Amino acid sequence: MKNKAVINPLAQIVGKNITAAAVDLGWTFPQLAKDMDVREETLQRWLTGERMITVFGLVRASRVLGVSMEALTKGLL
């Protein structure tokens, strides 16, 4: 029996913000993963909140998407 992933609500907020930024720019998730230099599976886990994005991943997402880290973490506090 496969274990269900535990969703971290804080990670989910960041994932939704990254997803929204990518969609607004018309990016595909494979393209975003490639430009961030991460595996698609890793990006998917970050976007769904299954895993908390690393600080380095957050910086990369911010740079690649041209969006501030503040915008990507909006709603955490």
Residue locations for each model-derived region?
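Short C-terminal boundary/hinge segments that cap the last helix of small helical domains
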Residues: G66-L77
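Helix-turn-helix DNA-binding elements, focusing on the entry/boundary residues of the two helices
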Residues: I18, F29, V55-L58, M69
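Recognition helix of helix-turn-helix/homeodomain-like DNA-binding domains
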Residues: V38-I53
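A short, Lys/Arg-rich alpha-helix, primarily the initiator
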Residues: M1-G26
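Short alpha-helical "recognition helix" segments of helix-turn-helix
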Residues: L32-A33, A61
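Short, basic-rich loop-to-helix N-cap that marks the start of a DNA-contacting helix
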Residues: E50-R63
